[in-house]
């Protein structure tokens, strides 16, 4: 524990340190922590292996003390040299009865106490008796006297983050509104261009009509060609007819000669 304390000090003077974390440094008793740490407000000794609090220093400004997951069964009177204590975590220890907790009555500002996973919590009317013993207590094992759960620091962070996210969502909505306004403006411009499109359609119709007049000239030319073809056909028919008439005359003359010969 002494080496760990020196490491955590980081060359600072003992009376300048306000927070000290000695978690998991194995020791059955407190060694190396002295009365010099007069400015210390938060001390953590989680899972150290402590069996006793004998030798606990006088820490006049200590407000938060973490002693969970040790093997402490008694000796809470050694803590009374830190009268400003407000938060005490003794969960996961060997405290078996409420009598062992009597020294805590000296702490007039103790607001939070955690005794979870101690045999003392199995005593009849345990919570009611503890709240009666310690009038300043607000939360016992994470709940108040009305069994309302204490709000953790993590919940506060979530609420802050939640508000931020709502603001972000609101910002997104504003951007969407801006986009819709832009689209409305585009729609107005669309109405102006519609008249232009209408005028273009009229021009196209006029050009088609002019092309239709030109097409009429083509039809007249086609009609003239058809008339010429008809006249050619009539001339050909007359020529054929004139050829056939001499043939008939020759046949008539031949028949007349034959009759004379027969006579």
From Swiss-Prot:
Record-annotated LRRCT domain positions: 118-156
PTM note: Phosphorylated on serine residues.
Swiss-Prot/TrEMBL GO biological process terms: nucleocytoplasmic transport
Region (Disordered): 144-263
Cellular compartments per GO CC: cytoplasm; endoplasmic reticulum; nucleus; perinuclear region of cytoplasm
GO molecular function, one term: histone binding
UniProt biased composition (Acidic residues): 144-189, 198-232
Function: Implicated in a number of cellular processes, including proliferation, differentiation, caspase-dependent and caspase-independent apoptosis, suppression of transformation (tumor suppressor), inhibition of protein phosphatase 2A, regulation of mRNA trafficking and stability, and inhibition of acetyltransferases as part of the INHAT (inhibitor of histone acetyltransferases) complex.
Protein name: Acidic leucine-rich nuclear phosphoprotein 32 family member A
Lineage, opening ranks: Eukaryota, Metazoa, Ecdysozoa, Arthropoda, Hexapoda
Name of the coding gene: Anp32a
């Amino acid at each position: 524990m002494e080496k760990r304390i020196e490491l955590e000090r980081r060359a600072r003077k003992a009376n300048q340190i306000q927070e000290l974390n000695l978690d998991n440094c194995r020791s059955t008793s407190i060694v190396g922590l002295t009365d010099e740490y007069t400015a210390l407000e938060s001390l953590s000794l989680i899972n150290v292996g402590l069996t006793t609090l004998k030798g606990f220093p006088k820490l006049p400004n200590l407000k938060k003390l973490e002693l969970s997951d040790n093997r402490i069964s008694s000796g809470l009177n050694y803590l009374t040299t830190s009268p400003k204590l407000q938060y005490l975590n003794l969960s996961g220890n060997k405290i078996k009865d409420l009598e062992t907790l009597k020294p805590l009555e000296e702490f007039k500002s103790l607001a939070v106490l955690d005794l979870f996973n101690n045999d003392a919590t199995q005593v009849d009317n345990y919570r009611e008796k503890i709240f009666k013993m310690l009038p300043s207590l607000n939360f016992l094992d994470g709940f108040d006297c009305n069994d309302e759960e204490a709000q953790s620091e993590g919940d506060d962070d979530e609420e802050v983050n939640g508000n931020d996210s709502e603001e972000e969502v609101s910002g997104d909505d504003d951007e969407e509104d801006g986009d819709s306004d832009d689209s409305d403006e585009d729609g107005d411009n669309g109405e102006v261009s519609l008249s232009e499109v209408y005028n273009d359609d009229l021009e196209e119709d006029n050009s088609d009509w002019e092309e239709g007049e030109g097409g009429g000239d083509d039809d007249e030319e086609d009609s003239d060609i058809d008339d010429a073809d008809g006249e050619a056909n009539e001339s050909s028919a007359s020529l054929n007819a004139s050829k056939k008439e001499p043939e008939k005359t020759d046949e008539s003359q031949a028949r007349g000669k034959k009759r004379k010969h027969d006579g």
